[in-house]
């Protein structure tokens, strides 16, 4: 649920533990 400050529109999430939701990366 915490935003990782990343976009995953083109590339996957870089930070470990972050998942892609609606083109944004979130961790828990």
Swiss-Prot record:
SUPFAM superfamilies on file: Cyclotides
Post-translational note: This is a cyclic peptide.
Disulfide bond as UniProt keyword: yes
Keyword Disulfide bond appears in the UniProt entry: yes
Transmembrane intervals: none
InterPro entries the record matches: Cyclotide, Cyclotide_sf
Record-linked Pfam families: Cyclotide
Crosslinked residue numbers (Cyclopeptide (Gly-Asn)): 1-28
Keywords noted in UniProt: Antiviral protein, Disulfide bond, Knottin, Plant defense
Disulfide bonds, paired cysteine numbers: 4-18, 8-20, 13-25
Recorded superkingdom: Eukaryota
GO biological process: defense response; regulation of defense response to virus
Record text about domains: The presence of a 'disulfide through disulfide knot' structurally defines this protein as a knottin.
Function: Probably participates in a plant defense mechanism. Has anti-HIV activity.
Family to which the UniProt record says this protein belongs: Belongs to the cyclotide family.
Name of the protein in its database record: Cycloviolin-B
Species, as recorded: Leonia cymosa
């Amino acid at each position: 649920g915490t935003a990782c400050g990343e976009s995953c529109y083109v590339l996957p999430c870089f930070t470990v533990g972050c998942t892609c939701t609606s083109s944004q990366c979130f961790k828990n």
